[in-house]
Amino acid sequence: MAPRLQLEKAAWRWAETVRPEEVSQEHIETAYRIWLEPCIRGVCRRNCKGNPNCLVGIGEHIWLGEIDENSFHNIDDPNCERRKKNSFVGLTNLGATCYVNTFLQVWFLNLELRQALYLCPSTCSDYMLGDGIQEEKDYEPQTICEHLQYLFALLQNSNRRYIDPSGFVKALGLDTGQQQDAQEFSKLFMSLLEDTLSKQKNPDVRNIVQQQFCGEYAYVTVCNQCGRESKLLSKFYELELNIQGHKQLTDCISEFLKEEKLEGDNRYFCENCQSKQNATRKIRLLSLPCTLNLQLMRFVFDRQTGHKKKLNTYIGFSEILDMEPYVEHKGGSYVYELSAVLIHRGVSAYSGHYIAHVKDPQSGEWYKFNDEDIEKMEGKKLQLGIEEDLAEPSKSQTRKPKCGKGTHCSRNAYMLVYRLQTQEKPNTTVQVPAFLQELVDRDNSKFEEWCIEMAEMRKQSVDKGKAKHEEVKELYQRLPAGAEPYEFVSLEWLQKWLDESTPTKPIDNHACLCSHDKLHPDKISIMKRISEYAADIFYSRYGGGPRLTVKALCKECVVERCRILRLKNQLNEDYKTVNNLLKAAVKGSDGFWVGKSSLRSWRQLALEQLDEQDGDAEQSNGKMNGSTLNKDESKEERKEEEELNFNEDILCPHGELCISENERRLVSKEAWSKLQQYFPKAPEFPSYKECCSQCKILEREGEENEALHKMIANEQKTSLPNLFQDKNRPCLSNWPEDTDVLYIVSQFFVEEWRKFVRKPTRCSPVSSVGNSALLCPHGGLMFTFASMTKEDSKLIALIWPSEWQMIQKLFVVDHVIKITRIEVGDVNPSETQYISEPKLCPECREGLLCQQQRDLREYTQATIYVHKVVDNKKVMKDSAPELNVSSSETEEDKEEAKPDGEKDPDFNQSNGGTKRQKISHQNYIAYQKQVIRRSMRHRKVRGEKALLVSANQTLKELKIQIMHAFSVAPFDQNLSIDGKILSDDCATLGTLGVIPESVILLKADEPIADYAAMDDVMQVCMPEEGFKGTGLLGH
């Protein structure tokens, strides 16, 4: 099918030869494209919006043919949420609670701990009514033990694939969005659980934590002098093993028990010797628990960065661990079997994911617990290879060592759990108490009800989809109208009818109607012609309206469009005629004045008028029968002229002909008559028409004022030439010898006066000297002699006595300010005094200084500049200028600076394709001071960025801003200002002397190898509170 624009042209081509009064039914049907050939499926790739008979590509392809039932619904099979046979139940990750889920699964598979918790008394009896639980009440555990009871009961007998531990997490007060230290959580929770169970009367419950997890060791110190041995007994629930520098678990245990020498300042005070003596100290394992928890210290404190980091060291460990060589009392049973491996995925200590590999004590099979997902390992062997491959690669990482049979190695394992081997088989009959089982049954009933409800919803969706499938297959074949009676329906409604994701709404054709309540000819591109049979079914099933039959073809709109198109064709011819007439010179007084702007855009204005008559200006879109407008009519010109009608651009404010001949042009009478056909109401100005008399008077007055201003400016410039040119100016610090008196005016007066003298026709004349701004409310001077030679010199201008006499004649002076030099002493005067009139006001001067200092220290949203330095030598020169022995750099330094600047991304700034000249870092501070003197606006240089800061924000917060601007981590930033190093992160910028417009030098350390640490900088810079405020600490 031809493009849409060609179809539109073809539909109205007959209007070129048919007059409006000759329009017939055939012309109307052609305009509505009734008899265009319908498209064939397979030939037409997409729907032709210009052809109302094209019913291809409207969404029918998904309905033709066989359809899978699953496509009729978006509801997952509820059985996917059902627990598989002989599998375990997962736990939902509430955001960042994966570390909690791993420990819950490990503790759940400790059968002795689970059995003991089931024996704890519960408040669940309060919810019991006879033999059942109150249906209208939900059970809410009150204590940590009750939460664990309920969780373990669900993990044991729930029909769900995973359960929600939010009640347990909420009871502990944990932040679900904050990932915490898993090892610290384990310690704190075991302590909390032991304290909670200590109040139980049943000894099997009260002592379960000690029986399962508690061991004992002694700190043994031996005096080298007398040999006396002292012991300090201590209980432990896990052994914290250092892994740095080790490859095997046994090496870590040996280091833990290694003998330590106490010498020098660290000598031991021996009670037997009653003095400090050299000694040895070591740890002796006295007893080991049934469950031995070995914490591998992967997360350590980095002294260089001041933050935690993860050690990605490979550690080898065996499935069978014989602890007999490490305990003091031999002969017992100390052979342990690996039962769990807790894994941390990720290279950073502040992010990552926790999972657990746990051995089922009943079947001896290994399972991987990953929140909701639980995977059974093939066979009965632990498999860690996949977990190790998931870690991010690093250039410095070592190869994974080979492991023998029964051994494993990991760089992500942070805790190993071993179980004491016994001849007795584990208790396989841990029964859920009746009250807990009833709660589980109730939850299972809710789950089954949900499954049934979801299955019913799926069935309803499938049935509805099948019915829709049959409807579409039947009706789509009957949609083409052919020569039979037809109606029009919007393409959008048909597409929604064929869209299974949205419900079908009633047909609404109101947006397609013209002003005569019939089908608008311009809307035919968004309508489709369908058979009357299909339309009857649509309206009977879905309703809506109005129905657009053959009677809805609007003859009035077609006739009007025919008239407009013929006028547009005529406009094309007239446009060429007018252009030719404008080329000829206008003779005599037969011409007419036309605005130049109107002449440039008269055809567009005429088109807009025709489009307004047509009722739809958007359809023309600046085109006429396919021919575009002149490209020289820019958008800016049209925007300025769109508010004016034709020839109104030469009207003055009084409604008469404007006096500026540059804005208008004389055209011939023939050209004007052509233009007047399209703009009969346009203002008409024959060539003999006089310009506006009022505007002429105003123009003469303006010329007289300009002449007067020029005369005044010339007189003042001649009277004060040196003041205007800023030449031969007196200086307080080098008082001229030929005068003892100098006068003062404000620098603001001088600058405004110079503006007027330079451009007297644009600027207003200066009539008075306002020196009151330099005085306090008491009439005293606000500046000292010393300050006027330095920081306040930019506020005042010094005047010679001869110039002052001229200023008094030319201007009105409100206050006279002068400084007089007086020689003190009768003979050989050795001292010179400078006296100001009026005198200095000490109180106001002191107040001004205090206010200036306060403004410098108390600011908000002020601009400072950070300049990144890329050379160690140069930053030392800037920080300590006194070390500079030469003001120029050596050629070697210059050569070294170039590649550094090119490598740094903050220095790769282009300027029109040419390189910008680098400013020497050695002279950078002096350059900035010169810039400040030359201009009040700071001029940024390459490698520098502006930041908005406040005086009360800390240096650490500024470093965060610098990190975002330069991609340099705070711990890699070395900052200095005016040679002073900024190091106190807790100090505010105000106290550090950072004031608005300051320039801070940034030297970045070499980037760290672990780029993932940049992602954790924001978290690193936040104060680490751990489990503060949670139930683990008794809050």
Curated annotation (Swiss-Prot):
Coiled-coil region(s): none
Gene Ontology terms for molecular function: cysteine-type deubiquitinase activity; cysteine-type endopeptidase activity; deubiquitinase activity
SUPFAM superfamilies: Cysteine proteinases, DUSP-like, Ubiquitin-like
Occurrences of domain USP (ranges): 89-421
Sites of N6-acetyllysine modification: 956
Protein name per UniProt: Ubiquitin carboxyl-terminal hydrolase 48
Native species: Homo sapiens
Annotated InterPro entries: DUSP-like_sf, Papain-like_cys_pep_sf, Pept_C19_DUSP, Peptidase_C19, Peptidase_C19_UCH, Ubiquitin-like_dom, Ubiquitin-like_domsf, Ubl_USP48
Subcellular localization: Cytoplasm; Nucleus; Cell projection, Cilium
Enzyme Commission designation: 3.4.19.12
This protein's record includes keyword Protease: yes
Residue ranges occupied by any Ubiquitin-like domain in the UniProt entry: 929-1009
Catalytic activity, as annotated: Thiol-dependent hydrolysis of ester, thioester, amide, peptide and isopeptide bonds formed by the C-terminal Gly of ubiquitin (a 76-residue protein attached to proteins as an intracellular targeting signal)
Keyword annotations from UniProtKB, A to Z: Acetylation, Cell projection, Cytoplasm, Deafness, Hydrolase, Non-syndromic deafness, Nucleus, Phosphoprotein, Protease, Repeat, Thiol protease, Ubl conjugation pathway
Upper lineage: Eukaryota, Metazoa, Chordata, Craniata, Vertebrata
GO cellular component: cilium; cytosol; mitochondrion; nucleoplasm; nucleus
CDD domains listed in its UniProt record: Peptidase_C19L, Ubl_USP48
Consequence of changing residue 406 to R: In DFNA85; uncertain significance; decreased deubiquitinase activity
Gene3D superfamilies: Cysteine proteinases (3.90.70.10), Phosphatidylinositol 3-kinase Catalytic Subunit, Chain A, domain 1 (3.10.20.90)
Function: Deubiquitinase that recognizes and hydrolyzes the peptide bond at the C-terminal Gly of ubiquitin. Involved in the processing of polyubiquitin precursors as well as that of ubiquitinated proteins. Plays a role in the regulation of NF-kappa-B activation by TNF receptor superfamily via its interactions with RELA and TRAF2. May also play a regulatory role at postsynaptic sites. Plays an important role in cell cycle progression by deubiquitinating Aurora B/AURKB and thereby extending its stability.
Subunit note: Interacts with TRAF2 and RELA. Interacts with GPS1.
Compositionally biased residues, Basic and acidic residues: 895-906
Active site (record annotation): 98, 353
